[in-house]
A protein has these predicted regions:
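Protruding loop/beta-arch "assembly-hinge" segments enriched in small, turn-prone residues
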Residues: 329-334, 340, 353
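Core catalytic machinery and nucleic-acid-binding channels of phosphodiester-processing enzymes
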Residues: 345
């Protein structure tokens, strides 16, 4: 039945079948040419998880005997590098008049970081990136999300590098003509989202999960490609079923009735005309009330005056450019899509450590004690605590001895430790960086210097992380500019510690050029804030504030104004109960000011009374 249904679909939709065949061919070709790297990813993951398999020099052959004892130095050194901080956005305006908009973008992105699960995404990528050499962000606009007053919101997820198949021969995502992603989805989800029944389809790529085949899952493959106009198109399928085909994926899409052309309202199943078939069409423009400047003659003044009126104009929707897939590299590597993997860098040392660890373990376990007895003398071989040996005379007793046989593991331990140190040196990790005792650093300053040296070795990884987040923030802004029809609430903190409630409204970015034509202003520089890592470490910020207080940076110690500035800073750093303490100090300051004013008024009155002429005659 399944074969018959597929055959009928091919007969009914020859053009759709032709397009499906074309994309499936491109996908299979790209996957075949990427196969070696996909296999390498599986081995890298096995190393990180502490596989006991012993690989040959070419990484393909596996020894028949497994390691008996694995010291997983790859796991240890990768976990030592984990940075839980998320780089926060920094937006700079190119034009002076856009500085306020740049601040609003920055606050909007900070809100999105807090609400979209960036901490969980970063925590996952901190392991995937060094293991595989890179990882991918996927940015989408989800109309099912939002608040009571808004429809839709950004959706940010991570795609494992094994689930991204690039165009063969191209190592820059932005320069690719097409790129594939593959995901495992339930059949029910596919039917609900795309309206296609895939209940009879099989899972084609179970290796993107754990390799086990599930009857409830299917593999959904998505091709993002550059269309003829330079935009981004999308073709998505599952086995022999086309799920989506959009020539201009990032343009506004509306669903209309195939029969009468009426716009579909929500998720209605049947049109008013009776048709149940819907199709997607591009919605290119929207009507927006805009200011219009005109020059008119004023008969009262006899001069021409500029008048501003409102008129409704058709404005093209803003459309993002570029793939919604953003690569975060570990360390740049020439002629490769992904960066250098830490696993590949120290694989030889891990193999040696596995072999030596197993050898030491075997030596220790096979060593033991042997009893030397005269010929013919028997002993009790029981588990009793006290055993009896019967000898004929003292001479026979003198022949009884115990020989302890224990292999020397000193050299093995020395070589194992050398390989461990080589691995650490390769990645630029010191004992101080790991939080271990470092005998080479004799003072706190020396230890901090040692940590800074290690941090310098890892600076490239931080630069690549910041670059990926900068690009992600730029794409997030562009998606909001394109699809956020309702103003999105933005919460931020003012300099005095109070909360500021505003909105991100995309229409604020609609400008008119010198020719009178409307355009969307997206000319901003997106970076990451270099101080965000320190700001995440609240305890360090608290300690810094304490040091500044003692040094007199806030003012004279003991003065209420000094205390107010100090606790204002601690409140910004989220110090517990800092806000309550600050309010108490504010009350004391107010009381102090009232007392000073009262004392000043009293002094003025006394001065006024003392300066009046004496009306009484002298006695």
């Amino acid at each position: 039945m399944n074969w018959l249904r597929r055959t009928m679909e091919k007969i009914k939709n020859p053009e759709e079948n032709k397009e499906l065949k074309r994309w499936k061919g491109k996908y299979e070709d790209a996957k075949t040419k990427y196969d070696e790297i996909l296999k390498d990813m599986e081995i890298n993951e096995a190393y990180y998880e502490g596989s006991k398999s012993i690989y040959g020099p070419n990484k393909t052959s596996v020894a028949p005997k497994q390691a008996g004892n694995v010291r997983n130095i790859i796991y240890e050194l990768i976990e030592s590098q984990v940075d839980t901080s998320v780089p926060m956005p920094k937006v700079t305006a190119i034009h002076a008049e856009d500085e306020e908009l740049a601040t609003k973008i920055e606050k909007f992105l900070e809100n999105e970081v807090r609400t979209l699960g960036f901490k969980q995404i970063n925590d996952l990528q901190e392991r995937i990136v060094p293991v595989q050499g890179g990882d991918f962000f996927l940015i989408e606009w989800d109309n099912t999300k939002g608040t009571h007053c808004t429809i839709g919101d950004l959706s940010i997820s991570t795609i494992h590098p094994r689930n991204v198949i690039p165009q063969p021969g191209v190592v820059d995502v932005d320069k690719m003509d097409y790129i594939f992603t593959r995901t495992a989805q339930t059949k029910e989800y596919v039917k609900l989202r795309f309206g296609k029944d895939v209940s009879m389809e099989d899972e084609t790529d179970p290796e993107i999960r754990d390799g086990s085949v599930s009857e409830d899952l299917v593999t959904v493959i998505t091709a993002y490609y550059k269309n003829k106009d330079g935009g981004i198109g999308l073709y998505r399928w599952c086995n022999d079923v086309t799920l989506e085909d959009m020539e201009d994926y990032q343009s506004r899409q509306i669903e209309v009735c195939e029969k009468c052309g009426r716009t579909r309202m929500g998720r209605e199943e049947q049109c008013e005309c009776g048709s149940k078939k819907w199709k997607k069409e591009t919605d290119a423009t929207e009507k927006i009330m805009m200011a219009k400047m005109t020059v008119a003659f004023n008969p009262l003044t006899g001069e021409e005056e500029v008048q501003q009126t409102q008129e409704e104009r058709d404005v093209e929707y803003y459309k993002p450019t570029g793939y919604p897939i953003i690569l975060r590299k570990n360390i740049s590597k020439d002629r490769y899509l992904l960066g250098t993997s830490d696993v590949n860098a120290i694989r030889d040392q891990q193999e040696t450590v596995k072999k030596l660890g197993s050898k030491i373990n075997e030596k220790l376990l096979k060593g033991g004690s042997y009893a030397v007895l005269p010929e013919g003398l028997g002993i009790e071989l029981t588990d009793d605590e006290l055993k009896i040996i019967r000898v004929k005379d003292p001479a026979q007793r003198a022949l009884i001895d115990v020989i302890t046989v224990q292999a020397d593991c000193t050299q093995d331990r020395m070589v194992l430790e050398e390989n461990y140190q080589w691995a650490k040196s390769t990645l630029g990790i010191t004992d101080s960086f790991q939080g271990k005792y470092d005998s080479s650093a004799l003072s706190g300053t020396a230890k901090q210097y040692s940590i800074n040296q290690a941090a310098g070795r890892l600076e490239s990884k931080r630069i690549m992380k910041n670059a990926a987040y900068s690009k992600l923030y730029e794409m997030m802004f562009k998606f909001a500019l394109a699809y956020a029809d309702q103003p999105m609430p933005v919460i931020s903190q003012n300099t005095d510690g109070s909360m500021n409630y505003a909105h991100f409204d995309r229409k604020e970015f609609l400008k008119i050029d010198d020719a009178g034509e409307p355009y969307w202003d997206d000319e901003f520089i997106f970076e990451t804030d270099p101080t965000s890592t320190l700001m995440v470490n609240r305890e360090a910020m608290w300690n810094q504030a304490d040091m500044k207080l003692q040094s007199g940076a806030f003012g004279v110690l003991g003065d209420l104004k000094t205390a107010y500035l100090y606790w204002l800073e601690q409140e910004r750093n989220d110090y517990p109960h800092a806000g309550e303490i600050k309010r108490v100090i504010e009350e004391r300051l107010a009381e102090q000011q009232q007392q000073e004013q009262a004392a000043q008024m009293q002094a003025e009155q006394m001065q006024a009374m003392g300066g009046m002429p004496n009306a009484m005659p002298g006695m």
